UniProtKB/Swiss-Prot annotation:
<comment type="function">
    <text>Attaches a formyl group to the free amino group of methionyl-tRNA(fMet). The formyl group appears to play a dual role in the initiator identity of N-formylmethionyl-tRNA by promoting its recognition by IF2 and preventing the misappropriation of this tRNA by the elongation apparatus.</text>
</comment>
<comment type="similarity">
    <text>Belongs to the Fmt family.</text>
</comment>
<dbReference type="Pfam" id="PF02911">
    <property type="entry name" value="Formyl_trans_C"/>
</dbReference>
<feature type="binding site">
    <location>
        <begin position="109"/>
        <end position="112"/>
    </location>
    <ligand>
        <name>(6S)-5,6,7,8-tetrahydrofolate</name>
    </ligand>
</feature>
<dbReference type="InterPro" id="IPR044135">
    <property type="entry name" value="Met-tRNA-FMT_C"/>
</dbReference>
<keyword id="KW-0648">Protein biosynthesis</keyword>
<protein>
    <recommendedName>
        <fullName>Methionyl-tRNA formyltransferase</fullName>
        <ecNumber>2.1.2.9</ecNumber>
    </recommendedName>
</protein>
<dbReference type="InterPro" id="IPR011034">
    <property type="entry name" value="Formyl_transferase-like_C_sf"/>
</dbReference>
<dbReference type="InterPro" id="IPR005793">
    <property type="entry name" value="Formyl_trans_C"/>
</dbReference>
<dbReference type="InterPro" id="IPR005794">
    <property type="entry name" value="Fmt"/>
</dbReference>
<dbReference type="InterPro" id="IPR002376">
    <property type="entry name" value="Formyl_transf_N"/>
</dbReference>
<dbReference type="InterPro" id="IPR041711">
    <property type="entry name" value="Met-tRNA-FMT_N"/>
</dbReference>
<dbReference type="GO" id="GO:0005829">
    <property type="term" value="C:cytosol"/>
</dbReference>
<keyword id="KW-0808">Transferase</keyword>
<dbReference type="InterPro" id="IPR036477">
    <property type="entry name" value="Formyl_transf_N_sf"/>
</dbReference>
<dbReference type="Pfam" id="PF00551">
    <property type="entry name" value="Formyl_trans_N"/>
</dbReference>
<dbReference type="GO" id="GO:0004479">
    <property type="term" value="F:methionyl-tRNA formyltransferase activity"/>
</dbReference>
Length: 304
């Protein structure tokens, strides 16, 4: 099968790698234009751009697909299907319909739960116990297309965002190959109208701890928002970012936000948050033992 691949970040790399090493032929790769990075502001190609270059796949970097030029470009590429994974641009209907098998997408959540821009982060932030990877036939809606293949899995209690990212990227790549091999036999399954949720992009403001929340909820945020935007609190007008934590459901009578002992354990609306790794603004990352050597605070103090 001849494939146009559309993707940009590391999440899309396992799928393109699988396709390159399969009996299919990737005839073109579309990705976000190179971006200026670093002190010298040199242009850096996306991970998909770099991989496609290595595999000698023609690469296209339009700034939009919503014009006649992009439509003509895609129409003139001889392909059977378009695979879209974290591309970063909306795909207009004329391109969704441009090829025989339309456009397929890998979505890392249990659709229709966590449609939208941040499914991986929200899966962890919401404390989900299970998740899925779906191969979806794209339509004009936001992650509303029929499901062609799906695999469910349990989530370890301490799973990090990077671990979930890697698992879904690799599992999605495997499911994509299986889907392409059986595409003429698969009966598309419409998504349920129940249990629909949408995820928006994270903001820096969401990372600030609300100590009225449960310790469980705050710990989920720590795992789901690392590295960005990061979960943080204020102490003596300084920002401290929590990079790793554990929690206890132990009952207490402290006001939420109270530092209850010299190990920097903090009372929450329910339970206690035990910080294990953190970073003070302008300082390097420290584990809790290293941090406490230079951190003097009386017990029964408040953070914000």
């Amino acid at each position: 099968m001849k494939i146009i691949f559309m993707g940009t970040p590391e999440f899309a790399v396992p799928a393109l790698t699988k396709l390159i090493n399969s009996n299919h032929k990737v005839v073109a790769a579309f990705t976000q234009p190179p971006k200026a990075k670093g002190r010298g502001l040199s242009e850096t190609k996306s991970p998909i751009h770099q991989l496609a270059d290595e595999a000698q796949i023609p690469v296209y970097t339009p700034t939009t697909l919503r014009n006649e030029e992009a439509a003509n470009l895609i129409n003139n590429i001889d392909a059977d299907i378009i695979v879209v994974i974290a591309y970063g641009f909306i795909i207009p209907q004329n391109i969704l319909d441009a090829k025989k098998y339309g456009c397929l997408n890998i979505h890392p959540s249990d659709l229709p739960r966590h449609r939208g821009a941040a499914p991986l982060q929200r899966t962890i932030i919401e404390g989900d116990k299970t998740s899925s990877v779906c191969i979806m036939q794209m339509d004009a809606g936001l992650d509303t297309g029929d499901i062609l293949m799906k695999e469910d899995f349990d989530l370890p209690k301490k799973i990090t965002l990077q671990e979930l990212h890697d698992k879904c990227a690799n599992l999605g790549a495997e499911l994509l190959i299986k889907t392409l091999a059986n595409i003429d036999k698969i009966v598309p399954k419409p998504q349920s109208n129940e249990g629909v949720t949408y995820t928006h992009k994270l903001t820096k403001e969401e990372g600030r701890v609300n100590w009225q929340d449960s310790a469980f909820s705050i710990n989920c945020k720590v795992r789901g928002m690392n590295p960005w935007p990061g979960v943080y609190f204020k102490y003596n007008d300084k920002t401290i970012k929590i990079l790793e934590a554990e929690y206890s459901d132990e009952e207490h009578n402290f006001t939420p936000g109270t530092i209850i002992n010299k190990n920097l354990e903090i009372a929450c609306g329910k339970g206690i948050l035990m910080i294990k790794k953190l970073q003070q603004e302008g300082k390097k990352v420290l584990n809790i033992e290293e941090f406490l050597r230079g951190f003097k605070t009386p017990v029964i103090n408040k953070v914000q």
